[in-house]
Design a protein with these regions (language model features):
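Surface-exposed short loop/turn segments
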Residues: 83-154
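C-terminal/domain-edge helix-coil "capping" segments
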Residues: 18-39, 49, 130-199
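Residues at beta-strand starts and edge strands
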Residues: 5-8, 40, 97, 146-148
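Sec-dependent bacterial lipoprotein signal peptides
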Residues: 1-18
């Protein structure tokens, strides 16, 4: 695992821990061989069908994660339905890492709860990317901001492997999706820095 990959993992974990009054990180996992996350170029992506919200969140994520760029502007025609094509497009733009954030409904029977190996369901970028976007497109209304959690996953694109995953605790108070994601990313980044996955 390269040093850049290790740094990126650390940065994202730290993002999930910074907010003093924000959500807490309830579960996280890292690949055993991952010591520090360091990517040359990492893509940030927020899974939502709301294009304006996606741009706003991806822009803010890119300011928090060193060496990262928002997917919507770096690869405007990035495939959301064909994971193999998406990975090919990203590699073509010299991306070697992907940080993907999505809001999940903890009441959804398809969402595995923390502590039950939820992160093992998608060990590679291709499977996660496809599942995440298919699930989002199936929503009939925007995600609520109460009773949901934020999930952050980091993949290396070179060998198409999951290197870090984390989820926040379910929200109990209503807040905007942007605020929820902002605070969650802060929590992840703090976690990543505290565990020395990033500097």
């Amino acid at each position: 695992m390269s040093r850049r990959v290790a740094v990126l993992v650390a940065v994202v974990a730290l993002v999930l821990a910074c907010a003093t009054s924000g959500p807490a990180l309830t579960s996280s996992w890292r690949a055993p061989e991952t010591q520090r996350l360091q990517f040359h170029r990492a893509m940030t992506s927020f899974v939502t069908t709301d294009s304006g919200l996606r741009r706003s969140v991806e822009d803010r994520m890119a300011t928090r994660i060193p060496g990262s760029f928002p997917a919507y502007s770096a690869v405007p025609n990035l495939s959301l339905t064909n994971a193999a094509r998406a990975r090919e497009q990203l590699r073509g733009k010299l991306f070697d890492g992907a940080v993907v954030v999505r809001v999940i409904d903890v009441g959804d029977a398809k969402v595995l709860p923390p502590g039950q190996g939820w992160y093992s369901a998608d060990p590679d970028f291709a499977s996660y990317w496809s599942d995440a976007w298919k699930g989002e497109k199936a929503r009939t209304s925007p995600a609520a901001t109460t009773g949901v959690a934020v999930e952050v996953v980091i993949y290396t694109l070179g060998n198409d492997q999951l290197v870090w995953a984390g989820r926040t605790e379910p929200t109990t108070g209503s807040r905007s999706v942007e605020e929820l994601v902002d605070r969650s990313v802060d929590v992840v980044m703090r976690e990543l820095r505290s565990t020395h996955h990033i500097r």
